[in-house]
Amino acid sequence: QMCIRDRGNLMGVVAAISAGGAGAVFWMWLIALLGASTAFIEATLAQIYKEKDPLYGGYRGGPAYYLHVLFASRSKRQRYSLFACLFALSGLLCWCGISQVISNSVASSFENAFHIPPLYTTIFLVAIAAIIVLRKNATVKVLDIMVPIMAACYFFLTIFIIVKNAGQLPDVLSRIFSEAFGLRQAVGGGIGAAIMNGAKRGLFSNEAGSGSAPCAAAAADIDHPAKEGLFQALGVFIDTYVICTCTAMIMLLVPQELTEGLAGMDLLQAAMAYYFGEFGVVFIALILFLFSFSTFLGILFYARSNVAYLFGDNWLSQTLYKVLALVMLFIGGIAAYQFVWDLGDVGVGLMTIFNMIALFPLAPKALQALTDYEHSHKR
């Protein structure tokens, strides 16, 4: 969570500005303020209610598990809880959508950079992803080296752009706030679009409240539940106010007439081309290609605990959901841009609703854990 090895730091911000204009950035910032506390609560609860994973070792958990405790605790023989099942199913829908967003973005960026038809890029992407699934350890070692290097390069390039164009920052900030609250935008419905897209893409990027991050938080080997919650809350701030803001700035510092009418990765690559020429277009394509694999691994990990909740601890279900993810990856590469985002949005929205059903009644448990953590550090 606390890194830029994630699809949302690029794709989410680009989609927000494409659909909601500069004003969407303000609403992403606001959502992050609310999301930090939500991230703390859900990650802490994931640690409190985690359980042993007999199939892979370690621990597993997430909203499906604390929803089960909340609604099925009176009947210990009850195998399922309705809301837990609904969350797990909506999570699978969401991660199918995210798989499609990944391949769609990579295919689009490769078409811009190398003029390769989306179908060919998609086939290659799915083939590499299949190797990751089958020979995970060897591939992950390569990703662990390459992805941080590319992420650091991207971060320093964005900082370089921002520093070089520091004189334009007041105008960009003015544009962000004016498009978030301006009279012209209010009359034309632009504020509504900015709020909606800023909120949706902010949630897509930092994941706070959607219930996906707790699936990873539950597996963390940490000495106190509240400690993991605090790490997740900090991650939301770093994700949104540092990484996502950098991505937003490099797009908004470009003259508007050069990016007018562009959407998706076309917009980001046009911005990078403005600063670095053809190198910028190719660099974004390559960094997206690498990020797609780390994100895909994250999707498989998130989905694993939910599949186990729905279908039990068996290798058949654990294999089938990976095959489904590969199929979704292929469909996304050749599907329409708006379709893949709509599918992901529906899944994220449903996950958030079911997750919030648990967070409100269980929040006192997380706050008790925080109090205990504070007392333990005072002693």
Q: What kind of feature is each model-predicted range?
A:
Residues 2-4:
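Short, small-residue-biased leader/transition segments that mark boundaries at the very start
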Residues 42-50, 54, 159-175, 189, ...:
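Extracellular/periplasmic helix-exit of transmembrane alpha-helices
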Residues 31-59, 68-104, 108-132, 286-297, ...:
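Helix-loop-helix module between adjacent transmembrane segments
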Residues 8-13, 22, 94-107, 129-142, ...:
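Transmembrane helix-loop junctions in multi-pass membrane proteins
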Residues 34-42, 121-136, 147-167, 200-203, ...:
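Selective recognition of specific alpha-helical transmembrane segments in multi-pass small-molecule
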Residues 18-57, 238-244, 345-358:
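Extracellular loop-to-transmembrane helix junctions
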Residues 83, 91, 104-110, 116-164, ...:
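Membrane-interface loop-to-helix entry segments
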